[in-house]
C-alpha cells in the first residue's frame, strides 16, 4: 500500500478485516488516496463493484494463517479455490488489464523438502506433474496459478503470480513463525517453545522486498509466469529463535513441541528467475529484518496483553 501510494497510484482496498487492521492504512484513507471497502469478496456483487475502473488488481485476499492454521483448518484454505476463481472472472468482466496474484512456496512438491542435509533451492520449473502441493492451501494456490495462465491464453488477461516464501515484517501477526518467536521473547516465555525439533530450514523474506518484487511483477510480467520471491539465505528455526532471544536481551531454555505442525523440513527458494525477469533481489537479510520487526513489535504492545492471548493467536487467522 505505502509503495503504491509513493508511486502516485490511487488505490481501492477490499478487506473484511477478519485478520487485517484498518489502522495500517487509515492515514491513506483519510488523505483520500485510498478508498476502503469493508466486505468479503465472496459475497454477491462485491468483487464486481470493487473492480470498476481498476487497471491492475493485486489479489492478496485469502483464507490463511500460519502453519498451525494451514495444517489444522483444511476447509478454510480450500475455500480459496472459489475466492480466486471469482476474482479472476470478475476481473475479466470488468476489463481489468492485469491481475497480480499472491501465490506461495506451498505449491512446491512436499517430496523435495524432506531432507535438511540437502542444500536444495526450489526452482519454478520444479512445479510440474505429478503435483504434490502442501495441504489444501498449496493446492488452491497452484490451481489459481494455472487458472490465471489459462485466462491469459483464452481471454488475454494480463497476469503474474508471485510465489512468496515465508514473509515477515512489521504489521505481521502471531500465527506466523517469526512474529510468534518475537511474541514469545516479548513476554519472557521460559522455557521458550519451538514447534518441531528446531532443525527446519527456512528463507524468511522481509516484507519490503516482497512488496518491491510484487510491483515489479506487475510492471514486467504479462503472460501468467510465476516467479519466486524469497531470499536464498538458509536459516534454521532454532537459530532464528536464538537470535530473537539475543536481540530481546533474554535467556531461556528451549522446549521442543514435536507434536505441533512444522511444515516442510527444508524450504528455500531459488530466486534466479526473479533476478532475470524482474531485476529483483532481496535487500534485507534475516538478521536486519528481524531487528526491524522486533523494534516495531516491542514498541506497539504490552506484555500482559500478548501473554493472555498468545496460545490462541498461534493457530488462529
Put a short name on every predicted segment:
Residues 111-121, 142, 146-219, 232-234, ...:
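NAD(P)-dependent short-chain dehydrogenase/reductase
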Residues 20, 65, 172, 235-236:
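Short alpha-helical
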Residues 3, 186-317:
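C-terminal substrate-binding subdomain of Rossmann-fold SDR/epimerase-dehydratase oxidoreductases
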Residues 1-167, 284, 299-300, 306-317:
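N-terminal Rossmann-like NAD(P)+-binding domain of SDR-like oxidoreductases, especially those catalyzing
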Residues 23, 48-49, 72, 82, ...:
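Generic recognition of short, well-ordered alpha-helical segments
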Amino acid at each position: 500500500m505505502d509503495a503504491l501510494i509513493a508511486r502516485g497510484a490511487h488505490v481501492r482496498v477490499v478487506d473484511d478485516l477478519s485478520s487485517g487492521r484498518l489502522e495500517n492504512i487509515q492515514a491513506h484513507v483519510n488523505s483520500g488516496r485510498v478508498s476502503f471497502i469493508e466486505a468479503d469478496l465472496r459475497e454477491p456483487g462485491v468483487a464486481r463493484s470493487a473492480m470498476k475502473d481498476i487497471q491492475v488488481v493485486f489479489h492478496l485476499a485469502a483464507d490463511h494463517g500460519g502453519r498451525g492454521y494451514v495444517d489444522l483448518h483444511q476447509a478454510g484454505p480450500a475455500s480459496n479455490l472459489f475466492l480466486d476463481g471469482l476474482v479472476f472472472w470478475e476481473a475479466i468482466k470488468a476489463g481489468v488489464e492485469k491481475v497480480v496474484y499472491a501465490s506461495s512456496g506451498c505449491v512446491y512438491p512436499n517430496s523435495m523438502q524432506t531432507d535438511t542435509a540437502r542444500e536444495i533451492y526450489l526452482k519454478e520449473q520444479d512445479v510440474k506433474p505429478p503435483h504434490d502441493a502442501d495441504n489444501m492451501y498449496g493446492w488452491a494456490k497452484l490451481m489459481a496459478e494455472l487458472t490465471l495462465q489459462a485466462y491469459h491464453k483464452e481471454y488475454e488477461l494480463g497476469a503474474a503470480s508471485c510465489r512468496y516464501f515465508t514473509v515477515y515484517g512489521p504489521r505481521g501477526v502471531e500465527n506466523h513463525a517469526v512474529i510468534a518467536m518475537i511474541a514469545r521473547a516479548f513476554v519472557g516465555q521460559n522455557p521458550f517453545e519451538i514447534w518441531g525439533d528446531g532443525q527446519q530450514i527456512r528463507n524468511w523474506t522481509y516484507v519490503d522486498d516482497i512488496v518491491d518484487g510484487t510491483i515489479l511483477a506487475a510492471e514486467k510480467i504479462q503472460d501468467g509466469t510465476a516467479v519466486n520471491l524469497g531470499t536464498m539465505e538458509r536459516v534454521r528455526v532454532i537459530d532464528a529463535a536464538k537470535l530473537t532471544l539475543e536481540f530481546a536481551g533474554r535467556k531461556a531454555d528451549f522446549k521442543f513441541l514435536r507434536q505441533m505442525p512444522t511444515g516442510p523440513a527444508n524450504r528455500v527458494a531459488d530466486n534466479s528467475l526473479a533476478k532475470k525477469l524482474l531485476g529483483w533481489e532481496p535487500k534485507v537479510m534475516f538478521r536486519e529484518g528481524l531487528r526491524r520487526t522486533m523494534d516495531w513489535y516491542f514498541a506497539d504492545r504490552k506484555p500482559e496483553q500478548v501473554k493472555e492471548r498468545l496460545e490462541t493467536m498461534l493457530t488462529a487467522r
